[in-house]
Amino acid sequence: MESKATASGSFLENIIGKPVYVKLFSGILYQGKLESIDGFMNVTMSQVSEHYEAEENGTLHKYPSEVFLRGSQVLYISEK
């Protein structure tokens, strides 16, 4: 039996390797390159900067290595 990708699955597959925003329920916004994502919305990113609520609020932290975000904390993912 052949499975079909959902619209959200296609979107997520298409943005791997691209710049994205990932916002957590805590209000922290991560901006960086999406390296991987799984079915639980666990996210790995590189070249990441961390902001509170919006990019305009300034950078809280820049990460020199990859960042892992737990899917249960992800509010949304958007393409930059």
From Swiss-Prot:
Organism: Kluyveromyces lactis (strain ATCC 8585 / CBS 2359 / DSM 70799 / NBRC 1267 / NRRL Y-1140 / WM37)
Protein name as annotated: U6 snRNA-associated Sm-like protein LSm6
Subcellular location: Cytoplasm; Nucleus
Family: Belongs to the snRNP Sm proteins family. SmF/LSm6 subfamily.
SMART domains documented for this protein: Sm
Function field: Component of LSm protein complexes, which are involved in RNA processing and may function in a chaperone-like manner, facilitating the efficient association of RNA processing factors with their substrates. Component of the cytoplasmic LSM1-LSM7 complex, which is thought to be involved in mRNA degradation by activating the decapping step in the 5'-to-3' mRNA decay pathway. Component of the nuclear LSM2-LSM8 complex, which is involved in splicing of nuclear mRNAs.
Keyword 4Fe-4S: no
PROSITE patterns per the UniProt record, alphabetical: SM
Top-level taxonomy: Eukaryota, Fungi, Dikarya, Ascomycota, Saccharomycotina
Superkingdom, taxonomy of origin: Eukaryota
Annotated GO CC locations: nucleolus; P-body; sno(s)RNA-containing ribonucleoprotein complex; spliceosomal complex; U4/U6 x U5 tri-snRNP complex; U6 snRNP
One GO MF term attached to the UniProt entry: RNA binding
Assembly, per entry: Component of the heptameric LSM1-LSM7 complex, which consists of LSM1, LSM2, LSM3, LSM4, LSM5, LSM6 and LSM7. Component of the heptameric LSM2-LSM8 complex, which consists of LSM2, LSM3, LSM4, LSM5, LSM6, LSM7 and LSM8. The LSm subunits form a seven-membered ring structure with a doughnut shape.
Keyword annotations: Cytoplasm, mRNA processing, mRNA splicing, Nucleus, Ribonucleoprotein, RNA-binding, rRNA processing, Spliceosome, tRNA processing
Biological process annotations from GO: maturation of SSU-rRNA; mRNA splicing, via spliceosome; tRNA processing
UniProt keyword Metal-binding, yes or no: no
